[in-house]
Amino acid sequence: MQIKPIITYSGSCPLFRSLESQILNAIPLDTCEWRRTFQRPTKHVRLEAQAQQFNVAALEKYKQGDWSILEHPILHIFVTECNDVDTYKATIREAIDIWLKTLTSYGVSDWMILLVETLDMRKTKNFMPRTTVLDKIRLDFGTKNDDRCISVLNPAKFEQKSTESFRCLVQRIRFLMLTSYNRNIVKYEELIRSKREKRNIEGWDFRQYFFMQEDLALIFEKLELPTEALIQYDELDAMFSQFITHTGLNEKQQWLNHFRKPLDAFHGICLTRADKFEMRNKIRDEGVSLLEFRNYLFERQAYLLLTCNDIPEIAKRLLNFLFSTLREVELIKLECQEGALCCWEFVCALEVLQLCEQAMEPNELTCFQHCAPIWNLAKDKLYELGKLCGLLPGCTPTSEQLHIVVQLSSGIGDAPSEQHQFLQATPQLRDRSPNRKPKKSGAEQLKEALGSNQAFQKLYLELAELAISTYKHVTRLRSARLVGLDLGNFYCALNEPHKAVGFFTDLLRELKAENWHMLSSQTLLELANCYRKMGDSLAYTKTCSSISCCAELETLVRTFYFDEFLKSLKTLKTTLSAQPSIENANYCVLEDHFRILDIEVVNQKPIIQDDYILVQLKVESLYPRGVVAENVKLCYELEASSLELAMENVSLTASPSTVKAKDTSSRLKVSLQLVYKQDNRLHSAAVACDLPKSKQPVRRTSSTKRKLSPSVQADFTNFVQAENIALQPGVNLIEMKAKATRVGCWQFKQLCISMSSLEFLSEQLPFMPATFEISTKPASATLEFKTLIAGIVQPISLNVSGGSFIFPPDAKITLRCSKNLRIRQARNTDDEAAYNDDQSFESTLQVPLVQFKSFEERRIPLEVLTDMPGRKVSKHHEHHIALNCPWSRTELPIAVDFQPAMEATCRLHTCGTQKFLQVIMKGMEAHLLLQHAQVKCDVPGVQLLDLNPESQQPIEIYKSLTVTYLYEIQVEPLKTEHELPVVKVHFVIKYASLSQPDVWRTYGCAFDLVDYTTLFKLQAQLEPNELCRLRTVCNMNLKITKVHENPYTDLMYEVLNDQNLWAVCGRSAGVVSMKDVDSHSISLDVMPLSTGFLPMPSIRLSKYTAGGKSKTDGHSKVHPFPPGQVYNSTKSMQIHVIASVAGDQ
């Protein structure tokens, strides 16, 4: 069927025929913009055309209103080759006028006048006419439509020069065709609308209306507007369905008799039909059945959707198409053979599925979502046909059923001999592998499946697996489980229960998760039958146990399976020992057999470690008769602490010591929420209430995670238990107990009931787990003391807290002190002498804990004593006391810091050649008494003379008070400093505290005396000494005298004067050499700057080492003398300075 716009031609017909092929071939070479009316969106379309000679007959239908837009000419062209104005006026103008009047009389305004020019070069060189034929044509006929009058050079004679004019001609034809379409489509839509409004008038025929509106759809399709064409087919589909529905309401339509043909042939849709308009011609000429008409309508819609590259929409529309067609067949009561409609549905489903398989990508779920129910539909229809034809497992077709197969096979028909995809250039369709055989059509597969039981079973299993996998791919697990139920039943019919078990198990898990109790009970019966056939005693035992607890089943059924459960349970132990180890094989879900009603901790007092936990469990047995549980265990774990970053939740519930499990709906969970700022200040406070979520009857499987057997067993390290408990049907109270071994806040987690080789584990407790606390108070020992002072007895106390520890009769605490620290228990008032004796202090002390009870607290007074440090320390004196307690295997070290009671320092003083030692005692922290200070020196040749007065009374010393002792050091002249470089001096003194004035202890300190020999003596004299005036230069004579021989030959002197008192005139420093001389004199000029008694300018003497004596030592160095080697006799001298004039001060 050729669908191309018609262009008519008049005038010089041979001339147009010479140009026809070029014009018709050039029109579709490029797209053009179609600006539609009524503000419809602009489209880019590609036009094609066919040419016919002008005929008035087509315009007669147009005038009468009985015309088709496919057959109506879209453009009328008048062609002339007249290049002479006179000839035009004589003949051509009249012919054009008659032609235009004819078009106008039929209401046609889509015309064009084409002037084909033939240039005469000789005339154009000598004569140029004022008016051309084209100007005359436009003047006569194109005053308002001059764009419809076009001239073109004859391409046959002027091939090179005619290119531009020919291109303009083709563009003008495209434009006028689209302009004509705008006008004609609007008129045609009005015509369709008027026809549709007459649908209730007697004699109205839907078939005529169908072809009229389909012609419009074909025009849109030809213009490459498949969406617009699809709208027309959808309107026809909806209108036809509406007519059929009204027919069911006793509104009879005469034209429906054409579709009431018996369904002798029930071909399915064919999306690979070679001639897509074959059925259109059959509908027009012969008449078709309802199924054939519906097939053609869906095929046309599918073709347009393929053009739009919307294959998922085809799959989406298929089920609606099938169901609505079946309803229409039922409404108009068509006669058909049993199974015919199933065959038709099956072929249609497989045809669409094969198309989708070529276009589907694994990552695009849209098409899979629509294909999954189609696979399921094909599977169901095939099963119905198998049941009808005796092809199910275990059945043998009878002669009558074989006759049905023959009739159905003939009604299905054959697939088209040449299968070509009627949309050739579809980029989304994937090419098959060249080595892969093309799939058979749906009709061929159905015929093959109806031919034998093996082919039927193979196709059914393939369709079922495809349906399940597609449902799973689009995460429609419920639908996949239902398909698995059918597949499981099919495997059971095939006597292959081991393959059916997996599908039944998946379905059972889904049904239990969504609380379909009745359906899950029926599935359990199927599972029990499978396990019995398989000989799986363990699974059969567990399934029989679950069936006996199903309240939805009859009592006789439950009792039968309960007896089977007890019978199989006796032989289960030997069966399990013979089988290999299977993880969680003997676990059962407790909730399927028992219901936990309440868990209550019976202990009335706080549970202390090593005490017994008493728990009362209320559980309901769902068995029809009583059973004996060998062991009932309830484990508990440490409660997880929930910490919030932005808020602090403080629970307002009761004390956890007595916890009773309540229903979550009886008490609201109220909690206090405190929100703090960054500086720990309270920002806001609120009371929050967490409402329990209502139980959902149907939930997503991905969120429920219901399992047939518990996969995780909780940690049963801590549990309460009861043994040999008889559980009767209904509510049972079970008393359980266990010893509390670990402390903490505990929460019940899982219940385990053991019967023979089976263990029934709870998935989770049905209410908020009861919490209880096992508390313990750890025993502790601490030392309590204030500031401790070294050298005197200091009191400390040992505080022992028993906590929950059980003390043995011989319990004791051992205290071990560090070096120079001793300890004892506090004094006994009856033994004063032993108290004053320091020998009672020990480095290790054992304190017995006589009759010490749990939770008892005892304070034991102790005393410590440590030696006073002999030298000055910058920090406190640190010691350690290690506690060894009976409740701990490790020692507990405790740091003990002592402050010194006093400290001793010494200074060396020189007077000429005499040396004096000054010992300064400074009080620090204690109030003490001092007496009998002595200095000892064991070095021969050194003698210390005590210069202190003899005192009979002790001297008190306290903080910030100092006591000074002075001694003279005499060294024999022969004992030089080289022989005695260091003189060790020991200072010893007795001290006692005010609290114990009779107990005297010894404090000793050692000093090292170095550089104590006077090497040089420095003298200075100021002249004039008596008449020293202000701002008058005076002469200061310095004298350096060597007292003892020494290696220092070069000395440097410096005058360190106060700039406010003295000014040195000239050099203030210099170097003198004492080599081979005993003394050296220096004269300096100084000037007093102030009046009064001024101290003599200070003079410093230092060791001098000249530089440059070696390569490594290039600079001179100055080293100071120690204080004892240089005696400066000018330190205490003062000079009286008087004013030079009366006004100076």
From Swiss-Prot:
Keywords: Cell projection, ER-Golgi transport, Golgi apparatus, Transport. Transmembrane segments: none annotated. It is found in: Golgi apparatus, cis-Golgi network; Cell projection, Dendrite; Perikaryon. Its main location: Golgi. Co-expressed with Shal in the nervous system. Pfam families: Ig_TRAPPC10, TRAPPC10, TRAPPC10_1st. GO terms for biological process: early endosome to Golgi transport; Golgi vesicle transport; intra-Golgi vesicle-mediated transport. GO terms for cellular component: cytosol; dendrite; Golgi apparatus; perikaryon; TRAPP complex; TRAPPII protein complex. Disulfide bonds: none annotated. May play a role in vesicular transport from endoplasmic reticulum to Golgi. Has a role in one of the several mechanisms underlying dendritic localization of Shal channels. Part of the multisubunit TRAPP (transport protein particle) complex. Interacts with Shal (via C-terminal dendritic targeting motif). Belongs to the TMEM1 family. This is Trafficking protein particle complex subunit 10.
